[in-house]
Every structure is written in C-alpha cells, then in structure tokens.
C-alpha cells in the first residue's frame, strides 16, 4: 500500500457500523422484504496536506462518504454480498484522496438455519488494482 510518492500510506480513516436497509440476497424473500446491512470501511490516504492546511477539501468528507455508502446499499438489488462489497469499494475509491480501501459488509440477518452472531465479508481494493 504505497502512496503516489512511493511512501507507504500509513494514515487510515475508519467508518464503522454504517447501517442501511437493502434488498440483497439470493432468496426471493430477502429481495422482497429487505434487511439491515452493516458496513465498515477503512480508507488508506495521506492526511498530511489536510493536517497542514486544516482544509476539508484536502481529505475525505466522511459525512458525505457515509451518505453515498448508505445510498449504495439501499439501491439496486444484488444477490451476493461480494457484489455489494465491490460496489462500496468503488464508492470509496471514487474519492481522489483514497489510495486503498478495506470494506466489510455484515449481514446479521442472513438466512442461516443455526444460531449465529454475524456473517461478513471483507475485501481489500486499491486504486492500483
């Protein structure tokens, strides 16, 4: 995970526990009724310019990003959390300051016939992939 200068991108911005209702899943009842999805994102970016200038435009506006992620979960149905995670990674990487992202999609209401706490998928995507 390198910044464009060749230096490692050590700075991370984390948004955890974003909740949104989506109609994703393999089964008809999931797509019809919907359920809550929980999203965590970890963004790799260089925050030195923002810290030096104290200027929001030099970093990621996490409030706006949260709204865009929420909209991405709430829109266009997909069958797999893998597809949803890829969509969310694309939202994060559309921010020019972001070098890489880890996206975790939790599906706590997944239709599993035994007791469980959560099912989740984490993906890593880079601007250079």
Regions found by a protein language model. Give the residues of each.
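N-terminal, polar/charged subdomain of small-to-medium soluble alpha/beta proteins
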Residues: 1-129
